Amino acid sequence: MKQSIQRLSALLLALALTLSLTLSVSAAETTSVLEATAEKAASAVMSYGQAAQVSWAVWQDGKIISSGSQRPEIDSTGAHLEGQGDIYGIGSVSKIFTTVAVMQLVEQGKLDLDKPVVQYLPAFKMADSRYKDITVRMLLNHSSGLMGSSFGSALLLGDASQQATEELLARLSTQRLKADPGAYSVYCNDGFTLAQLVVEAVSETGFMDYLRKHVFEPAGLKETWSPASSFELRRAPIYQAGVVEDPLPKECLGVVGAGGLYATAEDLAAFGGALTDDTLLKASSRKAMAAPEYANGLWPQEDFPDSLGYGLGWDHVEWYPFAQNGITALVKGGDTGYYHAGLVVLPERKMAAAVLSTGGASTYNEMAASQLLIAALREQNVEVAEIRFKLPAAKKAALPAELLDSAGYYGSQVMLKVELAEDGTLTMSYLDLPDLPARKFYYHDDGTFRDEGGSSALRMVKESNGQTYLYQWTFTSLSGLGNLPGSNYAAVKLPENSVDPSIQAKWEEQMSFLPMNERYSSQSYLLLGTALKELAEAEEATENAPGYIGNLRIDSETHASYTAQIPGTAGRDGYDVDLRRDDKGALWMECSNGTLGMDLAAVPELSTGKDNAAACTIQPNGYARWYKVGDKAAGKTLSVQVPKDAGFWAYDAAGNVVGSSLLWKDAPVELPEDGLIVFAGNPGAKFQLTFQ
């Protein structure tokens, strides 16, 4: 299965724009140290992550002490900069808002963190009896055992539909769990969408109405919004390089509680500040959120710090380098297709910093926010030492014979092939990233495999659950952003799975599945072009582990299942896959997270109709209508009359987007030879087509 619709979620392109930059800094009370640090950190975010625009804010003791932006120069008037600053999507930092709402209901005695979710959501059911053991706490600490992200029609453009949230319970009803509830914490978006539904059920209030009354207003947040809010003149623009020069429509995530909120850097920093006192939560609730929940389940037992360590909602409750200096630091990052956010809170110091960007990565933003806080503390004569961790001294050694059995295939978000030689050389290849060169590590007498520079190391660990994990240690230094330590399980060894070679071959046939049940406004259609390009440019098939297709275990000719159990993030977003053929022989792929795809080979040819006029009607099942551009239509100019809540996308043979009602409204499209066109909308929606 060379390509599948699931790969689209990984095709979130970094924006590399060559634009003139202006630096805007405003501060009530600031000094050159903090300003210089902010400018340097923002530049680093733009450099390392290719971010197009960055904004930041630092809050202390009830007020913003510094804020600013590095942004493209739009025009000389700066009209779009009215108010506090530009508004960005904050992605998964929204999870902290959801967590606060849950904890408020706990304080009111309306919720119990350790009661089953089904007690509050009787409609919540799954095709796995263990779902009854999932508690509210497990939703907030990522240990529910849910597969991960049921994000069909969740990542949208210019469309604030909440379809993904509304359909979550139906999607979960056919899913199984990937782990026992509470076994370990692994990043899980669906848990927070469920938590949003719990808040609505218990409070008997719409989620956004609840947040406005009980979170935004008490915290004084006037620049925090849902995707349905109107703030277009203030929204930080987003782009899709190589597709369209103009800014894209507003990015809308239909899972607000998991990642859909928008805010300014100032508002987000102020929200973090509100979590340093009793403004939103009692001290006991804030303490509960900051507890090391990750330690309740499977987790590497190492002395080195990592970039993850879940609390309730928080990504890390012992964030480097503050924890190593006796300072409590809480962090949450957020990444959407186009926006990235980092929030760091120092509750004991009554400080918080937020860094938001278009393009880039939340990790860089979190590191930048840390640098701002370090600089602010330095101005107050509080030094935070950025301790450089090193591996303990060890010498190269011959490989113990018993470790040779650790060679094999390891699964995570990427597939790894680990080869071991008797001289102690470990060669690690990235199977689904064949362009990346293999890495070599060398065995040392302390049991680690280290690279030549000593900047990273691996070790095989046999855990209490009987599985063998590939533990990784890293320590990275980035100018302007500080250091980033890593100490986590990167992958798990895949058990042997013997299947008939003919079945393996069928799964490995080059197939490209087209999205069939995504909304017309889905980012999948925009990003599909990249997947089609990859398919066209691929010279050879990706290697798979015997008995596996990617990280899925082949169970039969038509079913493959997700089996990796890894804490942290390496084991996130699993799904099972079923293949079937319809009565016309077309091959379909059904993923357990609700995604549905049809093989490109089954797409019919577009008809120009009678007298160069035709119609296309969406099927009763709501599935999209795909067509190939054949000889009859190639070269003609197509005009489309688009019905309400519907749209079309057109691609050339190389996968480039050449037409879109979402991007270019009713502009006619010159149909390219061997191209594709898709029409999507509600059941019965009728498109009128005119060819010239």
Please place each PLM-identified region on the residue numbering:
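Sec-dependent signal peptide cleavage junction
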Residues: 21-29
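A short, well-structured edge-of-sheet supersecondary motif
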Residues: 43-81, 113, 156-158, 162, ...
